Design a protein with these regions (language model features):
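Hydrophobic adenine-recognition pocket in adenosine-nucleotide-binding enzymes
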Residues: 45-47, 80
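Conserved GNAT acetyl-CoA-binding A-motif
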Residues: 61, 68-79
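C-terminal "cap" of GNAT-fold acetyltransferases
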Residues: 36, 81-85, 93-94, 104-122
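Conserved acyl-donor/pantetheine-binding loop and adjacent beta-alpha core of acyl/acetyltransferases
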Residues: 15-44, 52, 107-108
Length: 122
């Protein structure tokens, strides 16, 4: 799914969210384990450059969490690449909990360290 924040037809922020996790996610000590599409993964979240600092990423995350509750999703998982401290702060502020740091290979960046975060929906 593509979640989008628009203003007057202009996309200000967007996120790709679905239940398709990377194989490395299986070895993470999540509180909520993946089964039968009960967990969503935020794969990418982006805010238009000139719109940064306006709280749009926070609003988009809140929208994703709200929709996940309506869809009976039990948790949201994601990873943050090493040195992206702004993303770490964003997700922690939104209520995500740090789980672990893992080596993950993505074609775009190669083998890197990623911090794993989880939001358990209650």
């Amino acid at each position: 799914e593509l979640f989008v924040l628009r203003d007057e037809g202009i996309i200000k922020a967007c996120a790709i969210v679905n239940s398709n996790s990377n194989k490395e996610y299986k070895k993470v000590a999540w509180k909520v384990k993946e089964r039968d599409n009960n967990v969503w993964i935020i794969h990418a979240l982006a805010v238009r450059y000139e719109c940064r600092g306006m709280g749009l990423a926070t609003q988009l995350i809140k929208n994703i969490i709200s929709y996940a509750k309506l869809e009976n999703i039990e948790a949201i998982h994601l990873d943050v690449i090493d040195k992206n401290t702004l993303a770490d702060k964003l997700y922690i502020r939104a209520g995500f909990k740090y789980v672990s740091t893992e080596n993950i290979f993505y074609e775009v960046v190669g083998n890197r360290q990623f911090r794993m975060y989880e939001y358990v929906i209650e």
